[in-house]
Regions:
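Helical segment within the ABC ATPase nucleotide-binding domain
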Residues: 190-202
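ABC ATPase NBD coupling module
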Residues: 66, 77-94, 117, 240-244
Length: 258
């Protein structure tokens, strides 16, 4: 297992990434603030989801990827040749996907799955407590406490997405990545998940990709505007969305392109 990286900042330095020889990300430099919601916005195809997947090395699953630069957690470069513990990395940097992806097992086992992989809370009583704690944290406990052994596939899509978030939380991450995590949900479920993120930032640093500017305006503390694989503007969300400095940002917010 890699050295302890807990409570250390996540920083991107001079990151360049190409797929099949085509540049996707160009000289990205970012520091993600602790215990804040960072929203990454920009037009379709600008590299938002690619950047998110690079942060926990899920981009490794894409063929013909070339990447250079640094993604630092504290003093450790997670894309360096010496970094190999991807299981531990993905525990610390969890991902909530665009579409809910519950595992084909019970609700209880979905929450417990990561703990078992990482050898956490090995006593049955401890695991029971963890499942209840994190189901409560995402507002699911009262809804499912009497059917924990039922298939997670029977949950509504909104419940499934909260369960996926719960699965990430149960292994005690430092960062939560969310890739369009509400785009497949109805408005009520979307609001529930948004409210959860706002509550969870007390204990986690949350990095979200969203195509919905309204969502970013509602919940972002910090904003990153990407365009054609480049960071155009970053800063406090109120400043970026209310008084942008860059002309491209102003045009994007005005709907000139999307």
């Amino acid at each position: 297992m890699e050295q302890n990286m807990k409570k250390e900042p996540l920083t991107v330095r001079n990151l360049n990434l190409s797929i099949e020889g085509r540049p996707i990300l160009k000289n990205i430099n970012l520091t993600f603030p602790e215990n804040k919601i960072t929203c990454i916005v920009g037009p379709s195809g600008c590299g938002k989801s690619t950047l998110l997947k690079a942060l926990n090395r899920l981009i490794d699953n894409v063929d013909d990827v070339e990447i250079d630069g640094q993604i630092m957690i504290g003093s450790q470069n997670i894309i360096g040749a010496k970094y190999s513990d991807l299981i531990e990395l993905r525990r610390r940097v969890g991902l909530v996907p665009q579409r809910p992806c519950p595992l084909p097992m019970s609700i209880f086992d979905n929450v417990a799955y990561g703990c078992r992989i990482h050898g956490m809370h090995t006593k049955k009583s401890e695991l029971n407590d963890v499942v209840e704690k994190y189901l409560t944290e995402v507002g699911l406990w009262e809804e499912v406490k009497d059917r924990l052994q039922s298939s997670a596939m029977r949950l509504s899509i909104g419940q499934q997405q909260r369960l996926c978030l719960d699965r990430s939380l149960a292994v005690e991450p430092d960062f939560i990545l969310a890739d369009e995590a509400t785009s497949a949900l109805d408005p009520v479920s979307s609001k529930t998940v948004e409210d959860l993120f706002v509550k969870l930032k007390e204990n986690y640093s949350i990095i979200m990709v969203t195509h919905t500017l309204r969502q970013a305006l509602r919940i972002a503390d910090y904003a990153v505007f990407l365009y054609l694989g480049e960071v155009i503007e970053t800063g406090d969300a109120a400043q970026v969305f209310g008084e942008p400095r860059e002309d491209l940002t102003k045009k994007y917010l005005a709907g000139v392109f999307s």
